[in-house]
Curated annotation (Swiss-Prot):
Subunit structure: Homodimer.
Source species, domain of life: Bacteria
Sequence positions that bind Zn(2+) 2: 162, 165, 188, 191
Residues holding Zn(2+) 1: 145, 148, 202, 205
Gene: dnaJ
Subcellular location(s) of the protein: Cytoplasm
Official protein name in the record: Chaperone protein DnaJ
Domain J, chain residue ranges per copy: 5-70
């Protein structure tokens, strides 16, 4: 690696600390490892340079000499014909485990496998969501085969240990590369990673251990749920394999809107219409709530759009105590198509209030009372 700057190879500045050198090497070793870049000669050369640079910069004595005299003193001293030569990979075994099968990237498939979760959407009416309801749902899920008790083998027969992988579910393959000998681990093709061979598969589940079943499940939905809420039913999902735990069933709630009420959190809103005269004089109205009708006194002088609160008449708080409130919005209706008597009354009301009339209003009044005479 003639005239190469080892610090530059690792993406570092001269004088970098030991910790910085280790971190840089770790990152680059993963990126350019030959097993991750099969057939890529450029990556292979880059990997070789990275290791050569690390051999020097990770050794205090070599690093000191390099800092004083440069890389020329170490050219050709990196890798011998035996692969990595004297390079010490101590402390970096976890990097190479992912390529050699020693780390967590290789999964064993002969142990218990947990079942998958299931999601099911339930649509409720507004009232069902407010008061709570019991719903029967139908779920299609994978369950342990009763015929073979989930073993996958026909009753009266048994499994045998896979002779290829000796029951581990994995096989190790040694390969020679320009950088030396590498051992990789892969799933055993003969037993598909289970570690066992089923000589006579179960006639019901065909050796799988699980079968599809349609089940009816009663779900108790509490009062106060709303659209977007999710209820977990533990252990009601897909069954596991080889003794694995079952998954969960998640009930996603969807609530149909009400024609009369609007819901915001645990509060309910409703509009009620009253006449202009009742708004001015005050009146008693009947208000519909989710629990039935109640009486409410609207005070005189109420303006259109005014909100009145009915405390505790809202929706129950899920898994808690108390309820929200109901808000009543008063809409004051302005009359249309007034008859002569109604108009006269309004003109009289305007005069009683001391309101000034513009020319058009005065003209209408004159014509109106003129016709009366």
């Amino acid at each position: 690696m003639a005239n190469k700057d080892y610090y530059e190879v690792l993406g570092l500045q001269k004088g970098a600390s030991d910790d910085e050198i280790k971190k840089a090497f770790r990152k680059l070793a993963i990126k350019y490892h030959p097993d991750k870049n099969k057939g890529n000669t450029e990556a292979e050369e880059k990997f070789k340079e990275i290791n050569e640079a690390y051999q020097v910069l990770s050794d205090p004595e070599k690093k000191s000499n390099y800092d004083q005299f440069g890389s020329a003193d170490f050219n050709g001293g990196g890798f011998g014909s035996g692969g990595f030569g004297g390079f010490d990979m101590g402390g970096f075994g976890d990097i190479f485990d992912m390529f050699t099968g020693g780390g967590s990237s290789t999964r064993r498939r002969n142990g218990p496998v947990n079942g998958n979760d299931i999601e099911y959407t339930v649509t409720l009416t507004f009232e069902e969501a407010v008061f709570g309801v019991e719903k029967e749902i139908t779920v299609n899920r994978s369950e342990s085969c009763e015929h073979c008790n989930g073993s996958g083998a026909e009753p009266g027969t048994s499994k045998k240990t896979c002779p290829t992988c000796s029951g581990t579910g994995q096989v190790r393959v040694q390969r020679q590369t320009p950088l030396g000998s590498f051992v990789s681990t892969s799933t055993c093709d003969r037993c598909s990673g289970t570690g066992n061979i089923i000589e006579k598969p179960c006639t019901h589940c065909r050796g799988n251990g699980n079968v599809r079943k349609t089940r009816k499940i009663n779900v108790n939905i509490p009062a106060g749920v709303d659209t977007g809420n999710v209820m977990p039913l533990r252990g009601q999902g897909e069954h596991g394999l080889r003794g694995g735990s079952p998954g969960d069933l998640y009930i996603r709630i969807n609530v149909s809107p009400s024609k009369e009420f609007t819901r915001k959190g645990n509060d309910i809103y409703i509009d009620t219409h009253i006449s202009m005269a009742k708004a001015a004089l005050g009146t008693e109205i009947t208000v519909k709530t989710v629990e039935g009708n109640v009486k409410y006194t609207v005070p005189e002088g109420t303006q259109s759009g005014t909100l009145f609160r009915l405390k505790g008449k809202g929706v129950a708080r899920v898994n808690s105590t108390g309820k929200g409130d109901q808000y009543v919005r008063v809409i004051v209706d302005i009359p249309k198509g007034l008859n002569q008597k109604q108009k006269e009354a309004l003109y009289t009301f305007m005069e009683a209030c001391g309101e000034e009339m513009d020319e058009n209003t005065h003209s209408f009044k004159k014509n109106l009372f003129g016709r009366k005479k």
